[in-house]
Amino acid sequence: MMFMQQFRNLLHPAMKGARNISILAGGGTMRGFPTRNPFNTATLYSSLPTMNIFGQMQQVRWKTYGNEYQPSNRKRKRKHGFLSRIRSVNGRRVLRDRRQKGRMYLSH
């Protein structure tokens, strides 16, 4: 029934009110969709073009995520190390605050 609803959305606005596709077929044939029995929906389904519902939801991703952090001990100690903390006013403040808080490690 979900397929029927999606198919109904593709129809002309005047035809959307019809409850059954066989009514729309009007005597057994719908343009481009041959059926022997207007009430045999199995043959109507087989003659309809297949639509991949999940194909529209798939996305192609060219960007990779999660590989931004490439650890380097040299950069880490240069940025957050004890000597760099002592050199700047804000760094000395960080060391002071960590000392007051009782941290075991003041910096890297």
UniProtKB/Swiss-Prot annotation:
Annotated keywords: Mitochondrion, Ribonucleoprotein, Ribosomal protein, Transit peptide
Biased amino acid composition, Basic residues: 73-82, 93-102
Name of protein: Large ribosomal subunit protein bL34m
HAMAP family per the UniProt record, alphabetical: Ribosomal_bL34
Function: Component of the mitochondrial ribosome (mitoribosome), a dedicated translation machinery responsible for the synthesis of mitochondrial genome-encoded proteins, including at least some of the essential transmembrane subunits of the mitochondrial respiratory chain. The mitoribosomes are attached to the mitochondrial inner membrane and translation products are cotranslationally integrated into the membrane.
GO molecular function: structural constituent of ribosome
Primary localisation category: mitochondrion
Range annotated as the organelle transit peptide: 1-20
GO BP, sorted A to Z: mitochondrial translation
Keyword Ribosomal protein: yes
The keyword Cell membrane belongs to this UniProt entry's keyword annotation: no
Subcellular location: Mitochondrion
Gene Ontology cellular-component terms listed: mitochondrial large ribosomal subunit; mitochondrion
Annotated spans, Disordered: 68-108
Family according to the record: Belongs to the bacterial ribosomal protein bL34 family.
Taxonomy, superkingdom: Eukaryota
Matching Pfam families: Ribosomal_L34
Subunit structure, as described in the record: Component of the mitochondrial large ribosomal subunit (mt-LSU). Mature yeast 74S mitochondrial ribosomes consist of a small (37S) and a large (54S) subunit. The 37S small subunit contains a 15S ribosomal RNA (15S mt-rRNA) and at least 32 different proteins. The 54S large subunit contains a 21S rRNA (21S mt-rRNA) and at least 45 different proteins.
